[in-house]
Amino acid sequence: MAVYTDINEIELGAFLRHYDIGTLTSYKGIAEGVENSNYLLHTSSGSFILTLYEKRTNREDLPFFLGLMQHLAKRGLECPQPVVRNDGAMIGQLAGRPAAIVTFLEGMWMRRPTVAHCEAVGEGLAHMHLAGADFPMRRRNGLTLPDWRPLWNLSRKCADTVERGLVAETEADLDFLEKNWPADLPQGVIHADLFPDNAFFLGDRLSGFIDFYFACTDILAYDVAVCLNAWCFEKDFSYNRTKGAALLRGYTSVRPLSEAEANALLVLARGAAVRFMLTRLYDWLTVPAGSFVVKKDPMEYVRRMRFHRQIESAAEYGLEMQGVAA
């Protein structure tokens, strides 16, 4: 979460008159994050999160994102719930931006996730996939295989200034992925960005997921692969198989992977690493110093890409056979 658009108390008060959430007592910006402007609101009725959607978020996608949160909450998944305005809408306008209010989720994200946290996230992700199975809306993943080559072409010319040989490495990975990407795996609603800062905990207990603004309809096992990349590598870029096994055990205890999904995990994990390397690389090369967008080091994901090239079976990620459906 972050703050790119400032608001004052007068315009906020006018905006809040469209909601039945009590009287505003205080508000403050939330500094973390990269995509939208977020504020923590305290009112006489409780705490809420106000989000102003910045230019990177397509307004046409907002009904999907907010509708998904509403749907998942009704299915018992812990996540922020959109607050409906007095006119029945979930989206308003504030400071020239589309804006929405969601409920406040208790907990904090884990900067050093443990094995227990990884298992809980895997289990929670599987519950999310099942809860989203009957969500009627669809949204194409705008950052999947067909999008990677065009995104890469925007950075390709300067990529070797980040790391010598990165052009050749990335070209080889994209060639491999385009030839081997699975076509017929189970699809549904995925989070697509379930990094540690998007999962809240109270102690070791998962209290819920946040930030559904990359959610889309895509391969379910790809979401698992994103999590393996996001949760199971240490600061020295080594893969923690114990954490991987815990995450996969948690997931498959709720939703076992098919044999085809298990066999595709290598390709999906490699693809997930490429996806996040490419977006980081683009920002690294194009976002000017002092910009509100927080640049993240693409080399963290180059190192993951190199790891995945050496993997020969899903067992090396920690997948146990009892987690694979017969």
UniProtKB/Swiss-Prot annotation:
It is an enzyme of class 2 (transferase). Coiled coil: none annotated. It comes from the Bacteria. Disulfide bonds: none annotated. Its EC number is 2.7.1.39. GO terms for molecular function: ATP binding; homoserine kinase activity. Keywords: Amino-acid biosynthesis, ATP-binding, Kinase, Nucleotide-binding, Threonine biosynthesis, Transferase. GO terms for biological process: threonine biosynthetic process. InterPro entries: Aminoglycoside_PTrfase, Homoserine_kinase_II, Kinase-like_dom_sf, Pseudomonas-type_ThrB. Pathway: Amino-acid biosynthesis; L-threonine biosynthesis; L-threonine from L-aspartate: step 4/5. It catalyses: L-homoserine + ATP = O-phospho-L-homoserine + ADP + H(+). Pfam families: APH. The keyword Repressor does not apply. Belongs to the pseudomonas-type ThrB family. NCBIfam families: PRK05231.1, thrB_alt. This is Homoserine kinase. It comes from Brucella melitensis biotype 2 (strain ATCC 23457).
